[in-house]
Amino acid sequence: MAASADLSKSSPTPNGIPSSDTANDTMDPFHACSILKQLKTMYDEGQLTDIVVEVDHGKTFSCHRNVLAAISPYFRSMFTSGLTESTQKEVRIIGVEAESMDLVLNYAYTSRVILTEANVQALFTTASIFQIPSIQDQCAKYMISHLDPQNSIGVFIFADHYGHQELGDRSKEYIRKKFLCVTKEQEFLQLTKDQLISILDSDDLNVDREEHVYESIIRWFEHEQSEREVHLPEIFAKCIRFPLMEDTFIEKIPPQFAQAIVKSCGEPSNTSGCTQRLGMTASEMIICFDAAHKHSGKKQTVPCLDIVTGRVFKLCKPPNDLREVGILVSPDNDIYIAGGYRPSSSEVSIDHKAENDFWMYDHSTNRWLSKPSLLRARIGCKLVYCCGKMYAIGGRVYEGDGRNSLKSVECYDSRENCWMTVCAMPVAMEFHNAVEHKEKIYVLQGEFFLFYEPQKDYWGFLTPMTVPRIQGLAAVYKDSIYYIAGTCGNHQRVFTVEAYDIELNKWTRKKDFPCDQSINPYLKLVLFQNKLHLFVRATQVTVEEHIFRTSRKNSLYQYDDIADQWMKVYETPDRLWDLGRHFECAVAKLYPQCLQKVL
């Protein structure tokens, strides 16, 4: 019997080189991209195309069956079913626009798709017909990122029609968050009964009074009274929390609606126990950025002080532990931060790398949501909301020959979801202040006082303050810009108070803020409960048994513009946190149940 060959050993090949059974499976990472690129070239040049697709208005596209079948179950079924279309050289598709078909084909041959507000819904519809969920998801993501009070209802109705869960949920969340703005839009009146109920029957509705919910239902009803009257009892029963309404308001409800209320749930109950809406729990708080727990080294925290109740909460700290960010609370109570720097691991490093981060705070989840980055990295920029847009102004960077102040200004358009460069300031500024009043932006630093008109993209100069200083504090109060404290040219700290009458273009000296410089105070100016307040960090050094001990107190002072004086109205729990020299304060309405309670 012949001996069997030992297959485990390599045997010579015809060219004498031993072979091995060990497979060497390699992959060219550029192979797929190369094929896609060649297919696109053949599509553009009309080479080897084997099907013509005709869409609305007679527009035709010559393409490849295998490419269409690869991205779309719709086309794969059409070309492999054995029916008439599988052998035809030309197929006609009704209900697809030429632009949408062009975008789908561009995606098929390049994996890229260009979305705009004008094409996104038509493309979503086409992708739904062709069963291409990857395009639908990209369209949904685009629509989510472009939600605003004007389009959110339309997007929600659109998502409901096509059954896209994420788009429907996110648009509904937005509607609840911006409820009072959204209900003023005409599209709100187009909601079906079930869609209206799905929005209103929620604890997360951002209303401070239940009466707003009732009024929105009546407005919706009055748009089509004859068809919608039959639905009122069900809507009232599922959506109105009558125990949260004022008795005097209920007593004034017209008989027509009172009867519907009785049909829905009997007489409105005055008993307690009804869950409050999210907006009813909101409390105006002072937020301190660049603070640190005393027992956690230098790890940053963001305490939120509820002056009315004395409670202290903690906001989610900025991502990447960002410091010296620009901070803005918009008129819609959205909190934004931009720029800043990430702390160095080296204690001696002072030349921090500027960042271009841009984040928005999500109240309901207590987390920061990433937004499009600034065009220019910047530390200590000022954020201002004006004419429906946001502006990032000035700041500093550490580049090239060292520290440089910035002239540059950029503008964020929430509808376009992008930043764009606008006219730079005539002078570079850091440690400056920027405020808005009647569609103009005002920027102050030392001997410079500038104004900016967004409509004209123009900067101009105004009368400078009587005591020029930097690192001061500015806020608009009763049609005047108050500028408080700061550092003069000789590096001396002062607590001067000046008010600029915007209409008269005139500065007026006020009484200085009474402050003992021995306590090394650091001040922040905020508009809290519609009044000017100063948040003061004071440091006191004492000697006990030849040992120096440092203690800090944080106090709040309120300004009486009639008497032109400051009164201490609150002293914070000093054991909870420490504030760095560069701490910043902002005021916003926050929701206690969404925050971590500290005290």
Curated annotation (Swiss-Prot):
Residues annotated as signal peptide: none
Record-linked PROSITE patterns: BTB
Ranges annotated as spanning the membrane: none
Gene Ontology cellular-component annotations: Cul3-RING ubiquitin ligase complex; Golgi apparatus; spindle
SMART domains the UniProt entry points to: BACK (SM00875), BTB (SM00225), Kelch (SM00612)
Keywords, alphabetical: Cytoplasm, Cytoskeleton, Golgi apparatus, Kelch repeat, Repeat, Translation regulation, Ubl conjugation pathway
Protein name: Kelch repeat and BTB domain-containing protein 8
Organism: Mus musculus
Organism phylogeny: Eukaryota, Metazoa, Chordata, Craniata, Vertebrata
